[in-house]
Regions:
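N-terminal membrane-sensor/transducer module of prokaryotic signaling receptors
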Residues: 2-157
């Protein structure tokens, strides 16, 4: 009888504690699925009200951990303000941007944004994570055209 009671108590404890004991903690970094979902949300916002959406992007309203949308003009390649503490390239031509390995990711971003609206292209390159450490790491960005803008969201691999 005592043995049955102990087994039942232990089983109940395991079932009660399992959801919290085995629950996954959210990652401090976003992933490809989350990046693409954020891009689609930002695109919908730009289509609804471009000026308001660009203000929201600059303020960081879309930002989630290390994920953030960014946009650039297709007419001149100028990068619009976006919420990244490492960003020093506002107003620069995206086509001039290169990673530490001299890969011209900006040219690839610009070319991806020339494709038909709604087509999403992924571009891989090296880029520092937001924060104090400026060491470049592998990153992939999803890029698409939204009217006269190229917009994207990247995640660290």
């Amino acid at each position: 009888m005592i043995r049955t009671f102990l087994i039942a108590t232990a089983s109940a404890a395991v079932l009660t504690l399992s959801p919290t004991a085995f629950a996954q903690q959210p990652s401090q970094y976003g992933n490809a699925v989350e990046a693409k979902a954020m891009l689609l949300k930002a695109v919908a916002s730009v289509k609804a009200d471009k000026t308001k959406a660009l203000d929201m992007i600059a303020r960081g309203d879309f930002k989630d951990r290390d994920l953030y949308p960014f946009c650039f003009n297709l007419s001149d390649g100028k990068i619009q303000p976006y919420a990244n503490p490492n960003a020093t390239n506002f107003g620069q031509d995206v086509r001039t941007q290169k990673d530490v390995n001299s890969k011209a990711w900006g040219v690839e971003f610009y070319a991806a944004a020339q494709k038909p609206e709604g087509q999403i292209t992924d571009v891989s390159y090296m880029f520092p994570k937001p924060g104090a450490d400026k060491t470049p790491v592998a990153k992939e960005s999803f890029i698409t055209r939204v009217g006269e803008l190229g917009c994207g969201v990247g995640y660290y691999k």
